[in-house]
């Protein structure tokens, strides 16, 4: 008898989701997975008024938290930043008594507008992606979470459909057994 995969909360944050072919392709096979809750933050909070208690309850109910978003100005879109600042509050996720996320897993799934070569010393963006994502890794550590290797889709809007489909298949496959196939 196969054991159930851990529950995954996929926090999707893209302010122009309708224009992101890459993210639509990535999300399509994921929608079929019963143990994955896809939570579109921009659809849920168009006014940016985040229901902190609801979000914290979602976090409590899931073992793996996936943050899927485009890379915006070397960070995440504004609503996700607001979400991180408000939901991962002291006393809940960090600080005195803040252990609600201890032992859970964090994985960033990110699309970029530039090719991989732009993210290196001497490249257009001057730093490797690992350095650019360091604030997310530090946030995971602050929340006592395990940091998993991020999935990066470079130059997302310029990828051929078959390349995006391959990324989507790998993503869905990882989500089927997220703790068994590397990623951390």
Curated annotation (Swiss-Prot):
NCBIfam families: PRK04930.1 (NF003430)
InterPro entries in the cross-refs: Flavodoxin_fold, Flavoprotein-like_sf, K_H_efflux_KefG, KefG/KefF
UniProt membrane topology term: Peripheral membrane protein
One GO location term (cellular component): plasma membrane
Reported function: Regulatory subunit of a potassium efflux system that confers protection against electrophiles. Required for full activity of KefB.
Keyword match Nucleus: no
Broad class of enzyme this protein falls into: oxidoreductase
Gene transcribed to yield this protein: kefG
Keyword Oxidoreductase in record: yes
Catalyzed reactions: a quinone + NADH + H(+) = a quinol + NAD(+); a quinone + NADPH + H(+) = a quinol + NADP(+)
Subcellular location: Cell inner membrane
UniProt-recorded Gene Ontology molecular function terms: electron transfer activity; FMN binding; NADH:ubiquinone reductase (non-electrogenic) activity; NADPH dehydrogenase (quinone) activity
Complex and partners: Interacts with KefB.
Taxonomic superkingdom: Bacteria
Source taxonomy: Bacteria, Pseudomonadati, Pseudomonadota, Gammaproteobacteria, Enterobacterales
One BP term from GO: positive regulation of potassium ion transmembrane transport
The name this protein goes by in its record: Glutathione-regulated potassium-efflux system ancillary protein KefG
Disulfide bonds: none
Family named by the database record: Belongs to the NAD(P)H dehydrogenase (quinone) family. KefG subfamily.
EC id: 1.6.5.2
Keywords of this entry: Cell inner membrane, Cell membrane, Membrane, NAD, Oxidoreductase
Main location: membrane
């Amino acid at each position: 008898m196969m054991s159930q995969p851990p529950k995954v909360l996929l926090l999707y944050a893209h302010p122009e989701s309708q224009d992101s072919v890459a993210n639509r392709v990535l999300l399509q096979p994921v929608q079929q997975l019963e143990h994955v809750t896809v939570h579109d933050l921009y659809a849920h909070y168009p006014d940016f008024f985040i229901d902190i208690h609801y979000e914290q309850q979602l976090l409590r109910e899931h073992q793996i938290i996936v943050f899927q978003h485009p890379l915006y100005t070397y960070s995440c879109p504004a609503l996700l930043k607001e979400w991180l600042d408000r939901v991962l509050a002291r006393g809940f996720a960090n600080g005195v008594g803040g252990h609600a996320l201890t032992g859970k897993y964090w994985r960033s799934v990110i699309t970029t507008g530039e090719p991989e070569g732009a993210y290196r010393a001497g490249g257009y963006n001057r730093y490797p992606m690992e350095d650019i994502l360091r604030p997310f890794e530090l946030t995971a550590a602050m929340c006592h979470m395990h940091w998993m290797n991020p999935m990066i889709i470079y130059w997302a809007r310029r990828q051929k459909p078959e390349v995006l489909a391959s990324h989507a298949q790998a993503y869905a496959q990882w989500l089927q057994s997220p703790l068994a196939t590397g990623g951390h």
